[in-house]
């Protein structure tokens, strides 16, 4: 029978519930169990697909096209198991279903309420699609005490009451703030957080305590006493220099074995060789390579979370530290670019939407191309690369993208024109988006084919514009190689400039499929080119 583990948080947000859930999933997986990790978000948006990155950070896209929270990226990167649309839900999606059912008369005229109707939808989500799994780990977004989170806490309380301890475990993550003047960790916020959780009917079985320094036995005993929990189930979560050190830190703290003990499951050895290899590679990484990310949201690193991690994975592969240099694309000009990109070994332009900051991105692409610096353009970054090539290499000075609704030669066009001229609504914005994993055919003897070591691949997408194929011939005459196409050959997936050191643009998002123990081949080749470039300088 499947067992359920609920991960909640208290005191402050952004404590690392997602990393805790992902780490525990990996540790249980290392003991031979099949684990699924899910995220329940209390916000009223149906999904994060139309949210500003400043509000939410990265939108993580699954194989089946779900636009989800960035924590699902942690789940996939730690476990190597692909998430799907059944692994993410929001209050907005719940209310959307509830109100649709109410209008259809599915509630047969009864008064629709938070309890039981909203909580029943939450419970159905948690308890459905569990076949083949030994554990379902559910992360509840937000912190205990948040008004918007109350229906979720009530739903998991009901599940816990029904399944009992044999099949349900509550893990609560809290913060132990360190007060420098007193030179001690403060346990009172944790005590109040647990009190708040118990007030709504949930008693945590395991308490995970975040802290910036080691937690003494006396402090653990104090927490256990006031929170009514055994000391062995108070797990330290000390700050780590790298997130890929977190799973082994939890293993050393005994989190995985405590979970098995709670469920009366025999403790079995863990197969953690690949994670110890990652730790070894991180420790051996002494050399650095400097990568400039030309970003629109340069102050919000979470907007590019998967890109950052994919670069780190390639760094782990080569035992190199990736020194990221964040460049504000809005302030990048021909006059200051030499200074801002001084001693850069590689330039990456990530995905995005909208006209703002595109001039600076194109300036960076020109700089990379004309100075033969390794360049990687992702999604919108590839589209801007084709515009830069059209303007400055081919001579189509008015080359533009149809997205900006300005006059000029449309090098980039809409994929689906069915909604053209219609009012822009959330509904038709979704309809015109190409989302999820699609097959891609590669051309032999190209940079892409050599990187993948295959001519057939699958990659994840999130875009509604594509390269205008009418210009393919003139681009090819000017040295551009189109090395990847959709199966129907309608959409250009990869472009290359083979005469340069490394210049590649991709329409998809390779960062979503990179893992610390299996770096993405394109990121591997990009970092390889950057390393070779820095060694030759």
Swiss-Prot record:
Keywords: ATP-binding, Glutamine amidotransferase, Ligase, Magnesium, Metal-binding, Nucleotide-binding, Pyrimidine biosynthesis. CDD domains: CTPS_N, GATase1_CTP_Synthase. UTP binds at residues 13, 186-191, 222. It is an enzyme of class 6 (ligase). The active site is at residues 379, 509, 511. The keyword Metal-binding applies. L-glutamine binds at residues 352, 380-383, 403, 464. Residues 290-536 form the Glutamine amidotransferase type-1 domain. Its EC number is 6.3.4.2. One of its GO terms (biological process) is pyrimidine nucleobase biosynthetic process. InterPro entries: Class_I_gatase-like (IPR029062), CTP_synthase (IPR004468), CTP_synthase_N (IPR017456), GATASE (IPR017926), GATase1_CTP_Synthase (IPR033828), P-loop_NTPase (IPR027417). Residues 1-265 are annotated as: Amidoligase domain. Belongs to the CTP synthase family. CTPSs have evolved a hybrid strategy for distinguishing between UTP and CTP. The overlapping regions of the product feedback inhibitory and substrate sites recognize a common feature in both compounds, the triphosphate moiety. To differentiate isosteric substrate and product pyrimidine rings, an additional pocket far from the expected kinase/ligase catalytic site, specifically recognizes the cytosine and ribose portions of the product inhibitor. This is CTP synthase. The lineage of its organism: Bacteria, Pseudomonadati, Pseudomonadota, Alphaproteobacteria, Rickettsiales. The gene is pyrG.
